[in-house]
Amino acid sequence: MQIAIVLYPSFTALDFIGPYEVLRNLPDTEVRFVWHEPGPVTADSGVLMVGATHSFDETPSPDVVLVPGGPGTTMVARDEKVLDWLRQVYPGTTWMASVCSGSVVLAAAGLLDGKRATSHWSVLSALKLMGATPVGDQRIVRADPDGKVITAAGVSAGIDLAMWLAGQIGGEAKAKAIQLMIEYDPQPPFDSGHMSKASAATKASATALLGKDMIKPEPLKAGVLLAWDQAVRRVRGRRSA
């Protein structure tokens, strides 16, 4: 089984590292980190770099695709090479998954039109703008009851998503063994990990932390252009109807 994890500049590291640690332990599995070309890709920290092992052209038929999120989402969601690859490989995949704002990329590729999806709380409104039905109260959302598109909420939810996929692919016993092997038994010392639980002050602080990355020139410009693209798409859709 081949698992392709999409990398791009300014991805969030935990979005893919958590799922990678789970999925790489499935039997007979090859994990690829894919981008336009092999080589280092810099995370949103500006310090951490991860090596893309394969290009999109070298990965024409993955069984599982996972798209992480991060401040670079708005830029990659306008990258036609990435979107075309997602559309091309989709029919042959067993699972098409995203973590955090990676669901915005799936939506930009047209894979979430009219479907249920989740994401980081800060971009749920963007999913609606892009034709999906946002779900903010679930960690893992299956787009259709029997479908193969799975989206996870923000950042740490990627581990839950990967554990779910491990159960679907390798069976419950294997998934439980992986869970114990990585000692995934979350017991956070604070209970503010969802908007429904956080205080107003915590929400304000978290929003400010996000803003440090999102107001940088490139993500900000790309976000505006992405919103423009979707507005034009809706207008053209109404005219052709």
Predicted regions and their residues:
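Extended, subdomain-level signal for the structured scaffold at the beginning of enzyme domains
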Residues: 1-96, 104-108, 124-126, 133-136, ...
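Structural detector of well-ordered beta-strand residues that form the stable sheet scaffold
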Residues: 96-97, 118, 135, 150
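A conserved active-site-flanking secondary-structure segment within enzyme catalytic domains
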Residues: 112-142
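A short glycine-threonine-serine/GTX helix/turn-capping micro-motif
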Residues: 146-154
